């Protein structure tokens, strides 16, 4: 319930401060100032505040301080936030899934990389050397080196956290779309947002050609691809705002 969520958050004053800072930031763009958690839950909704708590907690818990052989943890989280915001936008504009859930799934989609970095460092180094030496994506390098990939590891981790099966599958299958996923729409959004973000950060903005998107995603989100150069610059501004909030404290 709203009261239980508010009471739980209010036991952690650091979290209270972060949530209030977030809801009053440009990321949400609210007109009036929100001064307490109960008001925030009423205005933005139970799921939005719950997912904000999840997002803040995970970034705080998994913000490894060191970088490794050119793997920049700050850039990792910037990419994750960018996919989260892009996923949220696609959900809002298409209406095919909860924008809040898409944000969280987008934020967590690459969590398996952090698990590898923190707990299997030698293996991570081997994969990363393959990425840099052969100009491969992380996923391609994993497939050439080991029998498992970061998406499956992320799926396993989020299942252990008892997150909803649809979210778990969106993380697990975002590189390898399958009809067996619990929620096809959520999976298609995360899969697509990841490709958009990766493409937009590597290609000239006036020569954006998306490749590797699953045909089912093209069917579900087709009209959005035709106008990406019109709407993605606005999403970039929202990404910048989200990164400023979620990362500026955690990366220090």
Over which residues does each language-model region extend?
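Terminal helices and disordered tails flanking the catalytic cores of nucleotide-processing hydrolases
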Residues: 215-252
């Amino acid at each position: 319930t709203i009261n239980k969520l508010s009471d739980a958050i209010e036991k952690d004053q650091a979290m209270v401060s972060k949530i209030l800072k977030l809801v009053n930031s440009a990321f949400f763009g609210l007109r009036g100032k929100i001064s307490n958690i109960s008001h925030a839950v009423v205005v933005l909704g139970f799921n939005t505040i719950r997912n904000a708590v999840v997002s803040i907690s995970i970034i705080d818990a998994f913000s490894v301080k060191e970088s490794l052989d050119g793997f920049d943890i700050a850039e990792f989280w910037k990419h994750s936030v960018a996919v989260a915001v892009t996923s949220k936008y696609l959900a809002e504009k298409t209406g095919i899934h909860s924008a809040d859930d898409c944000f969280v799934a987008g934020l967590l989609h690459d969590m398996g990389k952090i698990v590898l970095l923190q707990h299997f460092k030698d293996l991570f180094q081997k994969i990363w050397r393959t990425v840099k030496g052969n100009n491969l994506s992380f996923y391609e390098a994993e497939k050439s080196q080991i029998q498992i990939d970061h998406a499956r590891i992320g799926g396993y981790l989020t299942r252990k956290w008892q997150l909803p099966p649809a979210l778990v599958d969106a993380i697990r299958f975002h590189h390898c779309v399958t009809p067996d996923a619990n929620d096809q729409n959520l999976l298609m959004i995360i899969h697509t947002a990841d490709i958009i973000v990766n493409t937009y950060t590597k290609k000239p903005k006036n020569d954006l050609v998306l490749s590797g998107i699953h045909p089912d995603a093209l069917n579900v989100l087709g009209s959005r691809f035709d106008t990406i150069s019109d709407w993605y610059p606005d999403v970039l501004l929202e990404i910048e705002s989200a990164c400023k909030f979620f990362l500026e404290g955690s990366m220090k």
